[in-house]
Amino acid sequence: MTVWNGTKEPFILKIKQKRSRLGSLLRIYKVFLPRNLNEKTLDAIFSNSFFSSDAKVVSMYGGGVLSIGDRCLIHGSIVLERAASKIEIGENSFLGFSSTLNSRKAISIGNNVLIAEQCLIQDHNSHAIDYQTRRNDINLAIARQVGNPKMDKDFSQVIEHPIHIGNDCWIGYRSIILKGVTIGDRSIIAAGSVVTNSLPSDVIAAGNPAKIVKKLN
């Protein structure tokens, strides 16, 4: 497993890979890099896992910790929303096309986990329950678009709790895993499910909200 401790500056990492004339795999980074992060460092971090040309790692405000085990295949996006964010992916795991891991707290994914296409795993609510606070979120988003990127959103009223997905789980197409959820080992989430509560090991869950439909053992 390799671990990256985030820089103090925001960055976006876009990974591309191609074969050289001799057949060896080359890694190409299209990235906005702070000065203290270079391609040699990135190679050391990601050398044991494969990132497709669609993969993206984003540190929105700088910082965060990303751990990725050996023999992983990443097609989607990994987003570290603040310096305290932590995302851990175990060995031999898969993140499908257009799927997103979005963390302000912590997301932990075990070994041999399959996450299908267009899934969302997010450990926070994004916005406050209070409507007036949400109005301000819109104003801030507009301000960033017109040249005030340093205006910070107030996350003090946004609820966040860590997510844990156990070993050998399968998260089906377009499923959503919300804050505070733990999914036990070997469990399966059916396509299109929204998981709002924790689930034990060895079950199949489906629906919105997801409920156990079958026990595997």
Question: Which role fits each region the language model picked out?
Answer:
Residues M1-I129, R134-R144, P149-M151, F155-D168, ...:
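Domain-scale signature associated with acetyltransferase and cell-envelope carbohydrate enzymes
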Residues V181:
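Extracellular carbohydrate recognition
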Residues L114, S187-I188:
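Short alpha-helix at the nucleotide-sugar/activated-sugar donor binding site of glycosyltransferases
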Residues I188-V194:
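A generic "structured core" feature
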